[in-house]
Regions:
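His/acidic/aromatic-lined binding-pocket segments of jelly-roll/cupin-type domains
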Residues: 143-144, 152, 174-177, 215-216, ...
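Functionally critical, mid-to-C-terminal surface segments that flank or help form catalytic/ligand
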Residues: 268-324
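Transition-metal
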Residues: 2-195, 255-284, 307
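Short beta-strand segments in beta-sandwich/barrel cores
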Residues: 317-318, 334-339, 355
């Protein structure tokens, strides 16, 4: 399934979503879609900007957008404590500004409005002045939970330059945090040996492309940074939190010959991917970090996002006064509460599987675990 961008180039739209080694740092070496449902009420008034411009921003929760896909499993709904009759849910889009798939606020006076409407209304007050100057009314990050009951397609994402040239769009840099892993769970990230573009095409044609990809057995807590151009695939048994640029461009390289939900083979983008792939081999693809209890553990810092992990048994306060950006908080385990220092009344309960957006106007936030709580936070800057 593909859509037409105003540049006239047909844009691949696929099941899953990478970006540029020299643009990002992590703790390793670097040089309407089928099966989509929003949980809960949607809609709400759009024409409220004038009346609400002076209203106070507050921590926002969202209605998850659940995606049924051919490789999806049954873990997301119970993990998030949501009730749905959907099956084979492969993704929960926690926070999305992707056109046509925008997240809807689930709490407070802005309930029922979309994230795009709020960005248009509050601009830098919501996302940060520098962020808004660079990205405009499109919320710049796409936040997901992913449940792989079977292997995802092998794929790659174009960088900003190529995406702009072909699709009048942004590229896609992303990262994975492994929330949970079944026995034998694995994923693919990066080339294991140097190949040429011509050899890449031959290996796709003769079904041997996986022979030159780096395979990782994974466990909870593992982190992978995926710059645009890096071939990758999530494997069977992985449950992952994904942070990425707001972009829905994916080039599917290899799909194991399987059929899609419509009973037909899913489209491949062999030639488009040929020019998007980074053919370099790197000494390390997995991010190494030291986990400190009750403290901030920085996982990735790059121009697109800075992501940290917290494993808390006691309250922790994150100072946001020096950050000209929003803060996205994903609760990946346990439960507790979140208090915005801008208004002590803005204390939210937070449980496993929930995602909260802290506005850029906040000067700080305190995370208070009930009986242990693990968080992933992301901001730009």
């Amino acid at each position: 399934m593909r859509k037409v961008i105003n540049s006239g180039v047909r844009l691949p739209i696929i099941d899953y979503n990478k970006s540029q080694p020299d643009q990002c740092w992590s703790r390793h070496w670097l040089p309407k879609r089928e099966g989509t449902h929003a949980v809960g009420r949607t809609g709400g008034s759009i024409d409220q900007a004038g009346a609400n411009m002076n209203k106070t921003m507050y921590p926002l929760k969202f209605k998850p957008i659940l995606k049924t896909v051919v490789w999806g499993g049954e873990k997301i709904a119970p993990y998030k404590e949501v009730v749905t009759d959907q099956h084979n849910i492969g993704e929960s889009w926690e926070l999305s500004g992707v056109k046509g798939h925008e997240s809807v606020i689930a709490n407070g006076e802005f309930e029922g409005r979309t994230i795009t409407e709020l960005v248009e209304q509050f601009k830098g007050k919501l996302v940060g002045e520098k962020v808004y100057a660079n990205t405009g009314n499109e919320f710049p990050l796409l936040i997901k939970f992913i449940d792989a009951k079977s292997d995802l397609s092998i794929q790659v994402h174009p960088d900003d330059e190529l995406a702009a040239k072909r699709h009048n769009s942004k590229g896609k840099t992303e990262m994975w945090y492994v929330v949970g892993a079944d026995e034998g769970a694995h994923l693919l990230s990066g080339l294991s040996e140097k190949i040429t573009p011509e050899e890449y095409v031959k290996r796709v044609e003769n079904n041997t492309i996986t022979d030159v990809l780096t395979n990782f057995n994974v466990k909870a807590g593992d982190v992978f940074f995926l710059p645009a151009g890096r071939i990758h695939a999530i494997g069977t048994g992985c449950f992952i939190a994904e942070i990425q640029q707001t972009s829905d461009i994916t080039y599917r390289i290899y799909d194991y010959g399987r059929l899609g939900l419509d009973g037909k083979p899913r489209e491949l983008h062999t030639e488009l991917a040929k020019d998007a792939i980074d053919y370099n081999v790197y000494p390390e693809y997995k991010t190494n970090y030291t986990e400190k209890k009750d403290d901030e553990n920085v996982l990735v810092e790059c121009k697109y996002f800075t992501t940290s992990q917290y494993d808390l048994d006691k309250p922790f306060t994150k100072d946001l006064s020096g950050i000209d950006s929003f803060l996205v908080v994903m609760c990946i385990e346990g439960r507790g509460s979140l208090t915005d220092h801008e208004d002590e009344d803005h204390t939210l309960t937070l449980h496993q599987g929930e995602t909260v957006l802290i506005p850029a106007t906040s000067k700080g936030v305190t995370f208070t675990p009930s009986s242990g709580m693990k968080l992933i936070t992301s901001y730009i800057g």
